[in-house]
């Protein structure tokens, strides 16, 4: 569980990272930065910071901010209410992000899963994204990603985002963060 004071501290850190990458946000957006530790209490290794610009029934746009070596755990976006699941395009804006998807296993991948969670990382086809590069993930595709040494900022453009419906390989994960005073 995250403390409100820790969330404020991380929001400030994300704001500074976005500024460094020349991505301007409003004070209101700064307050709306979501800090997700996935219920594991190890934000430094397993976590993600998100800023949603828009999320309608038809499309979604957000920034994903990862600190150096931080990992968003393996998950997929399944079909929901007759819709095929979220299709998303990741475009790297700053740093480097290693994306792992279904497909032929990459020999000698750059990343390792967080210690103690290795069994919950099953897809190993590596895609390296540098600033200006992008990759589209099809609906219901297992994927996970990890920031490089300087961290990463990734713009996500997708169909409707319904994070509550995401299915994570690790049964311990809680997608929606719990915040305490």
From Swiss-Prot:
Reported pH dependence: Optimum pH is 6.5. Retains more than 50% of maximal activity from pH 5.0 to 8.0.
Alphabetized Pfam families for the sequence: Lyx_isomer
EC number(s) per entry: 5.3.1.15, 5.3.1.7
Domain of life, per lineage: Bacteria
Activity's thermal dependence: Optimum temperature is 65 degrees Celsius. Highly thermostable at 80 degrees Celsius.
Keyword annotations from UniProtKB, A to Z: Carbohydrate metabolism, Isomerase, Manganese, Metal-binding
Catalytic function, reaction form: D-lyxose = D-xylulose; D-mannose = D-fructose
Amino-acid positions noted as binding Mn(2+) in the UniProt annotation, renumbered to this chain: 75, 77, 88, 143
SUPFAM superfamilies referenced in this protein's UniProt entry, alphabetically: RmlC-like cupins
Cofactor(s) needed: Mn(2+)
One MF annotation (Gene Ontology) recorded for this entry: D-lyxose ketol-isomerase activity
Assembly, per entry: Homodimer.
UniProt family annotation: Belongs to the D-lyxose ketol-isomerase family.
Function, as annotated: Sugar isomerase that catalyzes the reversible isomerization of D-lyxose to D-xylulose, and D-mannose to D-fructose. Shows optimum activity using D-lyxose as substrate, but can also effectively catalyze the isomerization between D-fructose and D-mannose.
Protein name stated in the entry: D-lyxose/D-mannose isomerase
Organism in which the protein naturally occurs: Thermosediminibacter oceani (strain ATCC BAA-1034 / DSM 16646 / JW/IW-1228P)
């Amino acid at each position: 569980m995250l403390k409100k004071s820790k969330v404020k501290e991380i929001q400030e850190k994300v704001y500074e990272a976005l500024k460094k990458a020349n991505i301007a946000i409003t004070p209101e957006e700064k307050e709306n930065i979501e800090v997700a530790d996935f219920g594991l209490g190890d934000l430094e290794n397993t976590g993600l910071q998100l800023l949603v610009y828009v999320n309608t029934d038809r499309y979604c746009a957000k920034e994903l901010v990862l600190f150096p070596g931080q990992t968003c755990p393996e998950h997929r976006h399944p079909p929901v209410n007759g819709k095929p699941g979220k299709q998303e395009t990741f475009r790297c804006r700053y740093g480097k992000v290693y994306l792992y998807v279904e497909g032929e296993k990459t020999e000698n991948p750059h990343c390792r899963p967080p210690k103690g969670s290795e069994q919950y990382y099953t897809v190993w086809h590596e895609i390296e994204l540098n600033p200006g590069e992008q990759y589209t993930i099809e609906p219901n595709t297992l994927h996970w990603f990890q920031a490089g040494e300087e961290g990463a900022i990734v713009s996500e453009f997708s169909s409707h985002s319904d994070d509550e419906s995401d299915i994570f390989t690790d049964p311990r994960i809680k997608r929606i963060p719990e915040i305490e005073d």
